[in-house]
C-alpha cells in the first residue's frame, strides 16, 4: 500500500481552481505607466536594471485596457481625480490599485482645498506604499504584498462557475 501512495503522491497534482488562477494572476502583474508627481521618478527607477521588477512578473503597460494594476504615484488634485477614476474604469477586471507615496495615501503636506486627501476617496486602494517619495525597494515590497493578497483571494467568486462548484 505504501508503494501505491508514493506513486500517487509523486504523479498527481491536487489543487483548486482558485489557487491556479490566483497563482497565474499574481505572477503576471501589468501596471499602467502612470505617474503624477515626484513618486513617478522612483516608480520608473524601480523598472530599471538595478531593481528589475520584471523578475517578479511586473511589466509596465502603456494603456489602461492592457493593465491590471494602477499605481497612483503622487498628488491627486480634485480636478484630476475624475480622470484617474475614468482610467480605473477602463481597466479590465480583476484590477488592483497601489497608492504610492504620502501624497497619494493622505494628501501629504498639501492640505489645501485643491488636493484630494487620499486616493481611497475615488478608487478602492489595495496596497499602500508609504514614503516621500518611497524608495524602489518599498514599491517592490508593495508588489509582493499585492501578490500575497491576490493569492489569498477567491478567483471564482461571483462567476457562474462559482455557483456550480460551491456547496
UniProtKB/Swiss-Prot annotation:
[4Fe-4S] cluster binds at residues 38-39, 103, 132. Gene3D superfamilies: 3.40.50.12280. GO terms for cellular component: plasma membrane; respiratory chain complex I. It is an enzyme of class 7 (translocase). GO terms for biological process: aerobic respiration; electron transport coupled proton transport. PANTHER family: NADH DEHYDROGENASE, NADH DEHYDROGENASE [UBIQUINONE] IRON-SULFUR PROTEIN 7, MITOCHONDRIAL. NDH-1 is composed of 14 different subunits. Subunits NuoB, C, D, E, F, and G constitute the peripheral sector of the complex. NDH-1 shuttles electrons from NADH, via FMN and iron-sulfur (Fe-S) centers, to quinones in the respiratory chain. The immediate electron acceptor for the enzyme in this species is believed to be ubiquinone. Couples the redox reaction to proton translocation (for every two electrons transferred, four hydrogen ions are translocated across the cytoplasmic membrane), and thus conserves the redox energy in a proton gradient. This is NADH-quinone oxidoreductase subunit B 3. It comes from Rhizobium etli (strain ATCC 51251 / DSM 11541 / JCM 21823 / NBRC 15573 / CFN 42).
Amino acid at each position: 500500500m505504501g508503494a501505491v501512495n508514493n506513486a500517487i503522491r509523486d504523479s498527481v497534482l491536487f489543487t483548486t481552481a482558485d489557487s491556479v488562477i490566483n497563482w497565474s494572476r499574481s505572477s503576471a502583474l501589468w501596471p499602467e505607466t502612470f505617474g503624477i508627481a515626484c513618486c513617478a521618478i522612483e516608480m520608473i527607477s524601480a523598472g530599471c536594471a538595478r531593481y528589475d521588477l520584471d523578475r517578479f512578473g511586473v511589466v509596465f503597460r502603456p494603456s489602461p485596457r492592457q493593465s491590471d494594476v494602477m499605481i497612483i504615484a503622487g498628488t491627486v488634485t480634485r480636478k484630476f481625480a475624475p480622470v484617474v477614476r475614468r482610467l480605473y474604469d477602463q481597466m479590465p477586471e480583476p484590477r488592483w490599485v497601489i497608492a504610492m507615496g504620502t501624497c497619494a495615501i493622505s494628501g501629504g503636506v498639501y492640505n489645501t482645498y485643491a488636493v484630494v486627501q487620499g486616493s481611497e476617496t475615488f478608487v478602492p486602494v489595495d496596497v499602500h506604499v508609504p514614503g516621500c517619495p518611497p524608495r524602489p525597494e518599498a514599491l517592490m515590497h508593495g508588489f509582493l504584498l499585492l501578490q500575497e493578497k491576490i493569492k489569498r483571494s477567491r478567483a471564482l467568486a461571483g462567476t457562474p462557475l462559482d455557483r456550480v462548484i460551491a456547496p
